[in-house]
């Protein structure tokens, strides 16, 4: 039987310990890490944090309990006792500024009758875990939690503090979440870099072809259309019917082809994407900014690549209609909500003026919504953090390429960028064409994708500490 060197004397024992430390931490046993990550994601998905009303405190307390058991200090900060944010920090040596891992614990509501499973039961099926929040954003919450646990357990020497922020209210109520944290607790979350949701590793046939890291995002700038006309009996139709006026206005906006325009982020995105694309696709991507080719390429995007069509323009989408009190009463007002996702540099007063000219009806009012996120410049690709993300991609997916991209949706990185933080969106592996997407019915995440997400974040955080 082998004998421990510590049994042969104190000097040998100390020498053995020094050799072990010099060799660095033992390799991570990823199978056990994966099992733990799945256990935490399952628990989080079973906590109903639908916003409204939110009730994020239960999820925040779960995270705090896990972290504190490992000796990691964690705080719950809240404007509303039911809607707490969690902030935890592992300190570095202070030679470089902190990193924040940001994720939100609230989720959008789920229409249970449209799901094939209970959206809050964390059902596992065919290698996937189903649940509201599986892709937005409890998988990032889980990855952030696991990285904090690994850093603490393995006693990793850090040059930067690592801050884990599990925030409330991202899905439409930032006043209790990121805005509250920035306004009242900025010293708790201030960082040079932030990592959050928004990106993805896109695979075809199980092989990752590119890792999209969001360095910019479009800006939510919705409006309400209010059409007015005389009320009356449904048996006496009128061409001035408010519903008809509204329908005509919405139809005109639906047919409006707003201009295609590239910025620094989308230009670099298409250049890098061309390097891994077929010759025909590469030709389109490399000439997307060419005025002579733009109309032809734009039509192709509209028909075959709707994500790219949306990425290169300010978009409008009618999302809600409201009119009438009874089927036989012509209403005096009719309303439509239009979701506008603007390019970061869009001149919104001019854009609204163009909408008025297009609608061409003085009886239809355009009422802009109060903005809840600022328009901000893109984060740089020439930073230690972006290089760390590229390093993690090369280590895990050497056949792929990292693409700086512009998110067509919106995240709370906008508020961080407005404070001068270089913020980047990352995300799990998604199979091209998979419809189990965020906010969809039967939202789901491949379990293997969760495991790779944790690993990707781990290697990124280690690399940026160098």
For the regions a language model picked out, list residue spans one by one.
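A non-catalytic alpha/beta surface segment that caps or lines the substrate-entry region
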Residues: 40, 50-100, 119-123
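Active-site metal-coordination/substrate-binding segment of hydrolases
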Residues: 96-163
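Hydrophobic h-region of N-terminal signal peptides that target proteins for export
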Residues: 13-23
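Hydrophobic, small-residue-rich alpha-helical packing segments that form membrane-like cores
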Residues: 140, 166-221
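Bacterial N-terminal signal peptides that target proteins for export
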Residues: 1-11
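Solvent-exposed, acidic/flexible segments
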Residues: 30-38, 52-60, 81, 134-137, ...
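Metal-dependent amide/peptide-bond hydrolase catalytic core
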Residues: 23-25, 74, 199-209, 213-216, ...
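N-terminal hydrophobic or amphipathic helices/low-complexity stretches enriched
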Residues: 22-54, 68, 73, 113-114, ...
């Amino acid at each position: 039987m082998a004998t421990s060197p510590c049994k042969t004397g104190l000097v040998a024992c100390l020498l053995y310990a020094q050799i072990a430390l010099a060799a660095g931490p033992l390799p991570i046993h990823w199978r056990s890490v994966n099992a733990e990550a799945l256990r935490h994601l399952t628990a989080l998905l079973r906590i109903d944090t639908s916003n409204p009303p939110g009730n994020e405190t239960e999820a925040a307390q779960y995270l705090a309990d896990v972290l504190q058991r490992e000796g990691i200090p964690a705080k719950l900060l809240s404007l509303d006792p039911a809607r707490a944010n969690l902030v935890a920090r592992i300190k570095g040596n202070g030679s470089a500024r902190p990193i924040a891992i940001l994720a939100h614990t609230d989720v959008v509501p789920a229409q249970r009758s449209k799901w094939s499973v209970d959206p809050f039961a964390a059902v596992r099926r065919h290698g996937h875990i189903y649940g509201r929040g599986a892709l937005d954003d409890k998988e990032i919450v889980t990855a952030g939690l696991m990285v904090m646990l690994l850093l603490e357990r393995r006693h990793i020497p850090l040059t930067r503090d690592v801050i884990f922020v599990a925030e409330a209210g991202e899905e439409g109520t930032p006043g209790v979440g990121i805005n509250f944290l920035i306004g009242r607790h900025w010293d708790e979350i201030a960082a040079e870099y932030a990592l959050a949701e928004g990106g993805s590793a896109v695979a075809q046939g199980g092989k990752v072809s590119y890792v999209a890291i969001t360095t910019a995002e479009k800006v939510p700038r919705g409006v309400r259309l209010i059409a007015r006309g005389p009320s009356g009996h449904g048996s006496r139709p009128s061409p001035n019917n408010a519903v008809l006026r509204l329908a005509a206005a919405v139809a005109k906006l639906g047919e409006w082809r707003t201009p295609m325009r590239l910025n620094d982020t989308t230009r670099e995105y298409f250049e890098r994407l061309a390097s891994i694309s077929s010759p025909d696709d590469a030709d389109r991507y490399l000439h997307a900014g060419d005025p002579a080719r733009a109309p032809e390429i734009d039509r192709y995007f509209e028909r075959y690549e709707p994500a790219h069509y949306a990425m290169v323009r300010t978009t409008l989408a009618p999302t809600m209609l409201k009119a009438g009190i009874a089927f036989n009463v012509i209403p005096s007002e009719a309303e439509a909500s239009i979701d506008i996702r603007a390019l970061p540099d869009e001149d919104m007063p001019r854009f609204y003026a163009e909408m008025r000219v297009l609608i061409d009806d003085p009886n239809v009012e355009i009422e802009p919504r109060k903005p809840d996120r600022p328009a901000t410049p893109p984060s740089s690709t020439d930073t230690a953090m972006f290089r760390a993300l590229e390093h993690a991609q090369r280590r895990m997916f050497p056949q792929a390429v990292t693409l700086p991209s512009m998110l067509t949706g919106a995240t709370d990185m906008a508020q961080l960028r407005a404070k001068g933080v270089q913020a980047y969106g990352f995300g799990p592996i998604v199979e091209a064409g998979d419809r189990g997407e965020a906010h969809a019915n039967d939202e789901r995440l491949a379990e293997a994708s969760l495991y790779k997400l944790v690993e990707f974040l781990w290697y990124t955080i280690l690399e940026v500490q160098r």
